[in-house]
Amino acid sequence: MINRITDNKFELVSKYKPSGDQPQAIEQLVDNIEGGEKAQILMGATGTGKTYTMSQVIAQVNKPTLVIAHNKTLAGQLYGEFKEFFPNNAVEYFVSYYDYYQPEAYVPSSDTYIEKDSSVNDEIDKLRHSATSALLERNDVIVVASVSCIYGLGSPKEYSDSVVSLRPGLEISRDKLLNDLVDIQFERNDIDFQRGKFRVRGDVVEIFPASRDEHAFRVEFFGDEIDRIREVEALTGRVLGEVDHLAIFPATHFVTNEDHMEVAIAKIQAELEEQLAIFEKEGKLLEAQRLKQRTEYDIEMLREMGYTNGVENYSRHMDGRSEGEPPYTLLDFFPDDFLIMIDESHMTMGQIRGMYNGDRSRKEMLVNYGFRLPSALDNRPLRREEFESHVHQIVYVSATPGDYENEQTDTVIEQIIRPTGLLDPEVEVRPTMGQIDDLLGEINARVEKNERTFITTLTKKMAEDLTDYFKEMGVKVKYMHSDIKTLERTEIIRDLRLGVFDVLVGINLLREGIDVPEVSLVAILDADKEGFLRNERGLIQTIGRAARNSEGHVIMYADTMTQSMQRAIDETARRRAIQMAYNEEHGIVPQTIKKEIRDLISVTKAALPDKEETVEIESLNKQERKDMIKKLEGQMQEAAGLLDFELAAQIRDMILEIKAMD
């Protein structure tokens, strides 16, 4: 067990001072948290600096904080921002560590068993270990996570009880330390020294913690006593300094001591016998044979190695949980009095609520056909009510909070004023009769001013037809559909910003990364057709795409005024009036956001330095593609090291697309 530091303070470092309505929002949020309010909503318009407000709140309430985003890209962006705001505190990143993941599944109609197949990202695995160890060591911790934080993880008690604590003067033999390291899943490797491994040279043991990627620790013995402990560069062996205490956390989150392992194995065997009897009674002899063979192999691995592939499927027995009891997750590593912030809560809460059912149906198939014991069903994400039971205090952050959040609390704190003075755009409704020619005139007016246009349609066919028509009319236009891959999408957005074309047509323009300050017109076709992208929230989010330009304008083409349209228009007008009054009072003139246009194509050029210009990937031979992947992987690691996770994710997607060609 380790002693957790509880008196560290968050130190916010920023050249900015709260402005606009940020000071009031920060004060209200902090007062409510300190007053014991369980749930509240920060309803912040796009571009109002919600992350900065969140940072101010974290610094002032000084609680360990979990920030949940609805995908890895957004989590990476938030992680980078919080790292800049809190350079002297522990800002951690916890997302799924799979670059590629095919879950274990069975399709009875074709008698197809799909074995679990995955590619683990070593960098993300390191960051996950860094997050859990930081939570057990100190109180000034921010963990930015995706929804994977509600999936099963090992017991925090077993994890912390398994920590190997070392200090100079400690009486412990070298061999005892080696055995202790093996017990917590470290591997001995005297040649290939990497994370989660140790090596031995006489009376010196070098240990590479699972939460580090460059620094290791050298433990020097004098007889059966630790003489000194040094931190060293893993690659060069250069000594960085001496340490007074070293806590070595397990190399895996699923760790169990020997006594608990024997109890767990006995329970697994008992469950196996019970399930085999059920299968035999039902005449399912093939299923019984399959289950017996697989489970006995896993038991043997657990007995000999303390680990097996798919060990998480036995986590109920290893944790000592009852049937149906929720698994341990990242949330259990936090102290009781912690703060949760849900970014883009209208999206994220839907994911949190929906994870359990999808996981359950897949695993039931595996159990019914003898691929897993029934206890595998308890290796799962949390149900909604189980997640709620972990909530001590929570802040939902969104421009358009969902029904769920509004049901949880009546406390809504608004943040509407943008530091740039930008206003929510003007919105007008025009009839559908002659809408295409009307829109063509609006596009041409924007082209003359070197501004861009977004057009959102409801169907793929309409988007394609519209694109073809505008091309015939001489408009430089592109259509962005759902089949376009991440990297290609990024290139399209870049070309739009550079003026390679002037109009982007799409169905869903609410994906991350589609914020283009050059867009001054957003046209919404079929605005009166109620649905996911034409409900109040969808319309407000779409309208927000024109809020980065001082000339922002939105035209809805519709023949009737739906309630969703009216509410979206009214809300936008309300915000705009507040923003205009603030600007007038403070003499602020709205300025279009100046955003750097990153040249992603240079990534390809850098990966192929012997080429004079960027080439089509399809034209490369297998060896050239292999060389490109190797160089791109280096650039991806470099981007991650610089905390530019958005670029790192884009390079990763490019690598996956190139690999898919082989």
Curated annotation (Swiss-Prot):
Keywords: ATP-binding, Cytoplasm, DNA damage, DNA excision, DNA repair, Excision nuclease, Helicase, Hydrolase, Nucleotide-binding, SOS response. Residues 31-188 form the Helicase ATP-binding domain. Residues 626-661 form the UVR domain. The keyword Lipid metabolism does not apply. Signal peptide: none annotated. ATP binds at residues 44-51. A motif (Beta-hairpin) lies at residues 97-120. It comes from the Bacteria. GO terms for biological process: nucleotide-excision repair; SOS response. It is found in: Cytoplasm. GO terms for molecular function: ATP binding; ATP hydrolysis activity; DNA binding; excinuclease ABC activity; helicase activity. Residues 435-601 form the Helicase C-terminal domain. Its main location: cytoplasm. SMART domains: DEXDc, HELICc. The keyword tRNA processing does not apply. Pfam families: Helicase_C, ResIII, UVR, UvrB, UvrB_inter. PROSITE patterns: HELICASE_ATP_BIND_1, HELICASE_CTER, UVR. Transmembrane segments: none annotated. Belongs to the UvrB family. The UvrABC repair system catalyzes the recognition and processing of DNA lesions. A damage recognition complex composed of 2 UvrA and 2 UvrB subunits scans DNA for abnormalities. Upon binding of the UvrA(2)B(2) complex to a putative damaged site, the DNA wraps around one UvrB monomer. DNA wrap is dependent on ATP binding by UvrB and probably causes local melting of the DNA helix, facilitating insertion of UvrB beta-hairpin between the DNA strands. Then UvrB probes one DNA strand for the presence of a lesion. Forms a heterotetramer with UvrA during the search for lesions. Interacts with UvrC in an incision complex. This is UvrABC system protein B.
